[in-house]
């Protein structure tokens, strides 16, 4: 069993893809370590996992995966950090530092720099370099030549629409519906990617 040997967990975003296994690891696999994340990721991730549990609990394939108590146990281990706050690990991780940088993809989302001596490892998944209305894009200016960069290419094929055109289309659609005495419902991702 590897989970009891884990010294620290770094969480980058609050959605199921990034935090979904944590309650299971704490509740069923015996994980017992500090979990580092920004405060928004901590709070939204906890709400997201409550919601995930409540919407899936009656499905046969989900029963006994984890409980709400497992969610509480996992999120009680969180150590909230601020962007650019240097945190030093203790115990077997003595001498290892971690620092969160804004990922620009979700509220509180983080790119992580993990350092030991003169070597840095950067973990950067689901980041966005473009400034949006509610989030600044990420910047790698403070990260210089890491020994290892871990990233993803999940959005590489996604075509990014022109911001002005996109905004005009949604406003036109909303106004058209309202002018016909219709209702407008705008569903959003509960994990902070609004």
Predicted regions and their residues:
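His/Asp/Glu-rich metal-coordinating catalytic cores
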Residues: 1-10, 15-19, 24-193
């Amino acid at each position: 069993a590897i989970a009891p040997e884990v010294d620290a967990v770094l969480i980058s975003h609050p959605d199921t893809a990034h935090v979904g296994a944590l309650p299971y690891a704490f509740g069923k696999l015996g994980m017992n370590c500090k979990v580092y994340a920004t405060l928004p990721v901590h709070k939204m991730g906890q709400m997201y996992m409550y919601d995930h549990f409540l919407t899936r609990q009656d499905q046969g394939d989900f029963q006994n995966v984890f409980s709400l108590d497992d969610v509480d146990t996992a999120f009680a281990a969180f150590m909230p950090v601020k962007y650019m706050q240097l945190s030093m690990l203790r115990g077997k991780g003595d001498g290892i530092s971690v620092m969160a940088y804004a990922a620009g993809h979700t509220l509180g989302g983080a790119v992580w720099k993990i350092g030991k001596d003169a070597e840095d490892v950067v973990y950067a998944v689901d980041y966005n370099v473009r400034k949006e209305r509610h989030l600044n894009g990420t910047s790698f200016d403070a990260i210089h030549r890491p020994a290892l960069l871990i990233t993803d290419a999940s959005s590489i094929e996604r075509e990014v629409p022109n911001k002005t055109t996109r905004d005009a289309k949604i406003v036109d659609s909303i106004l058209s519906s309202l002018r016909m005495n219709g209702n407008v419902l705008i569903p959003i991702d509960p994990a902070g990617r609004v």
